[in-house]
Amino acid sequence: MALLAIIGTACAGLAAVLAAALVALAYRFGLLYQLCHKVDPRSPRHGGELVAEVLKAHGIRFLFTLAGGHISPVLVACEKVGIRVVDTRHEATAVFAADAVSRLSGRIGVAVVTAGPGVTNTVTAVKNAQMAESPVLLIGGAAASLQKGRGALQDIDQLSLFRTLCKVCVSVRTVRDIIPTLRKAIATAQSGTPGPVFVELPIDILYPFHVVEKEVGGTKTPRGLQGKVVQWYLQNYIRNLFAGAWEPRDVSPLPVQVPMATEDEVQRCVELVSRATKPLVLVGSQAMLPPTPAEELR
């Protein structure tokens, strides 16, 4: 009886471990999410449209870029919603221009560059924005998530370049994550001490389903068990990218956390200065927040 109890306990433990492993795998492959959210393979929509919606809702009027294939859907979609797309001759110039717009308008500046060399060319300008405490959103294209580290076109570790320069460095993994990631990044850039943020958008979340399916999933009929397993994995990967992609989501700006002095603190400073015989006031950059657009100062 004791032996049977031990065997039963061991089997129950093994079953629990296997069940936990299966749940973890289902979560890893997005199977649980796909059960509850729709995938529309025939939809002509693409992730660039979601980027444009967020930027438009945040009052962005200008987008600076040097055009590239990885980011083309973003540029096309932004132009369609009325955002002026300014094509520069160098990626650093695009970020410098976004920095200038941010300082003059009081809104976040936006630059969009292609993967690899397009991103690396912006480093000097991003560092300048960091030192100037300018809220700038840098959107960089990237290789498909599935192909990273496998010799894809212009594939490098872009996030490591900006971790010491930007307040946030993040890579978006699915189409449904584009809107919440951009909203949070923009709010972070403008909150506290303003500064640049970097959002990486892999190419497979920016193009329509049928394009990604053709490029990633392939068109040949798989042969053998191994081929069928690989085909299933690729198809599931693509479906997870687009699951719930076009469900309605809030694109409005998140609250910006700007440190403000209380009335008591201001009054205490006034009293100190008024009593001083040789007053010296050291004013930090936070005193300029929230920013006032230049046209309102006329």
For every predicted segment, state its role:
Residues 2-298:
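N-terminal alpha/beta PP-like core and its mobile active-site loop of ThDP/TPP-dependent enzymes
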